[in-house]
Amino acid sequence: MPRVKRGVTARARHKKVLKLAKGYYGARSRTYRVAKQAVTKAGQYAYRDRRQKKRQFRQLWIARINAASRQNGLSYSRFINGLKKASIEIDRKILADIAVFDKVVFTTLVEKAKEALAK
């Protein structure tokens, strides 16, 4: 069986890692060993933060809805409960947009939630 020299595959793998590390500071973008660690860690951060991004946006939406509903005299939890009782199914992303950009419509939603809670 002939000897297999691994220069081609090793170079390809090194090039791939160094390409991913392009733009990193110092040896992280030039040295394979350090670049490999940096790329691996960057991948871990990216994986984690793709999940955290969803949580952070939901927190932001809830904070905006809470602020707007309190201006209309209702806490966030009571507002959401009122919407559910009034059979109004709008997700938090849309509610937050309405709260920021269309205060008249949001006030109407708060009034409907108050009516549903009073029943």
From Swiss-Prot:
Record-linked InterPro entries: Ribosomal_bL20 (IPR005813), RIBOSOMAL_L20_CS (IPR049946), Ribosomal_protein_bL20_C (IPR035566)
Annotated transmembrane regions: none
Gene3D superfamilies, per the entry: 6.10.160.10, Ribosomal protein L20
Pfam families linked to this entry: Ribosomal_L20
Domain of life: Bacteria
GO BP annotations, alphabetical order: ribosomal large subunit assembly; translation
Signal peptide: none
Coiled-coil ranges per UniProt: none
Gene Ontology cellular component terms for the protein in this record: ribonucleoprotein complex; ribosome
CDD domains referenced in this protein's UniProt entry, alphabetically: Ribosomal_L20
This protein's UniProt keywords: Ribonucleoprotein, Ribosomal protein, RNA-binding, rRNA-binding
GO molecular function: rRNA binding; structural constituent of ribosome
Function summary: Binds directly to 23S ribosomal RNA and is necessary for the in vitro assembly process of the 50S ribosomal subunit. It is not involved in the protein synthesizing functions of that subunit.
PANTHER family assigned: 39S RIBOSOMAL PROTEIN L20
NCBIfam families cross-referenced by the UniProt entry: rplT_bact
Similarity annotation: Belongs to the bacterial ribosomal protein bL20 family.
HAMAP family hit by this protein: Ribosomal_bL20
Name recorded for this polypeptide: Large ribosomal subunit protein bL20
Biological source species: Shewanella sediminis (strain HAW-EB3)
Gene: rplT
